[in-house]
Amino acid sequence: MAVIQFSQGVNEPEVPGIRLTRSPDGSTGTAVFSFEDPAALAQESTDEITGMYLIDEEGEIVTREVKAKFYDGKPRIIEARLVMRSTAEWDRFMRFMERYAAENGLEFTKA
């Protein structure tokens, strides 16, 4: 099971848009996740957003680079940025994404 959380223990049901970039030599990469109207921003949610947690059977990948975008004075979008600083981190992220994509009907397309 592969899930994304913003507060530990609370799964985010909204499936994000994800943009990936990677350095030409493959040594570093970045993933930017964009969640429109996520459950974590719902009025009834009282959980504090402490980061973005990507959790699967291998463990947890964490980033604290999480921002909210506001429209008409209300939070509407959560954008999270995960920086991978080695090929091992990139490979681990891609294994998570393969599991998450399979469970949520996502597909990978190269730009």
UniProtKB/Swiss-Prot annotation:
Superkingdom, taxonomy of origin: Bacteria
GO-annotated biological processes: photosynthesis
Cellular location(s): Cellular thylakoid membrane
UniProt keywords, alphabetically: Membrane, Photosynthesis, Photosystem II, Thylakoid
Main location class: membrane
Pfam family, one: Psb28
InterPro entries: Psb28_c1_sf, PSII_Psb28_class-1
Membrane topology (UniProt): Peripheral membrane protein
GO cellular component: photosystem II oxygen evolving complex; plasma membrane-derived thylakoid membrane
HAMAP family: PSII_Psb28 (MF_01370)
NCBIfam families the record matches: PS_II_psb28
Family: Belongs to the Psb28 family.
PANTHER family on file: PHOTOSYSTEM II REACTION CENTER PSB28 PROTEIN, CHLOROPLASTIC (PTHR34963:SF2), PTHR34963
Quaternary assembly: Part of the photosystem II complex.
Record-given protein name: Photosystem II reaction center Psb28 protein
